[in-house]
Amino acid sequence: MSLTEKFDSVTVATKANVYFDGKCVSHGIVLADGTKKSVGVILPATLTFNTGAPEIMEGVAGSCRVRLKGESEWTVYGAGESFNVPANSSFDIEVAGEPYHYVCHFG
C-alpha cells in the first residue's frame, strides 16, 4: 500500500472523535463513492481499541507497536506501512515519542 497523502472530494465530520482522554483524536470522512474512513493521530500512550468492522490501519507519520488480539508478539509499523484488524476483534497499540498519524480504512 502506498502512503496516502490526501483525499479529494470528501465530506468531513467537523466534530472530532476523542478517545482515551484525548490520547487519540480522529475525524470521520466519506469519499464520493460512499466509502468511510477516519484520519487521526495517537499521542504517546498504550491503548486498546475494539473493532466492529474489519479495519486497515495505515501509518502516515510516526511509528507504533501493535499486538493483535490473541497474539503475544508486538510488531512495529511506521509511515507507509499498514496492519489489518479483523471485525469484532481488538488490538493494543503503543506510541512512544512522536505522535502516530494514521488513516483507518473500514471494511
Swiss-Prot record:
Job of this protein: Catalyzes the phosphorolysis of diverse nucleosides, yielding D-ribose 1-phosphate and the respective free bases. Can use uridine, adenosine, guanosine, cytidine, thymidine, inosine and xanthosine as substrates. Also catalyzes the reverse reactions.
GO molecular function: guanosine phosphorylase activity; purine-nucleoside phosphorylase activity; thymidine phosphorylase activity; uridine phosphorylase activity
Domain of life, source organism: Bacteria
CDD domains in alphabetical order: cupin_PpnP-like (cd20296)
GO cellular component, one term: cytosol
InterPro entries found in the cross-reference section: Ppnp, RmlC-like_jellyroll, RmlC_Cupin_sf
Record organism: Aromatoleum aromaticum (strain DSM 19018 / LMG 30748 / EbN1)
Keywords linked to the UniProt accession: Glycosyltransferase, Transferase
Pfam family, one: Ppnp
Family: Belongs to the nucleoside phosphorylase PpnP family.
Substrates-to-products reaction catalysed: a purine D-ribonucleoside + phosphate = a purine nucleobase + alpha-D-ribose 1-phosphate; adenosine + phosphate = alpha-D-ribose 1-phosphate + adenine; cytidine + phosphate = cytosine + alpha-D-ribose 1-phosphate; guanosine + phosphate = alpha-D-ribose 1-phosphate + guanine
Record protein name field: Pyrimidine/purine nucleoside phosphorylase
Enzyme Commission number: 2.4.2.1, 2.4.2.2
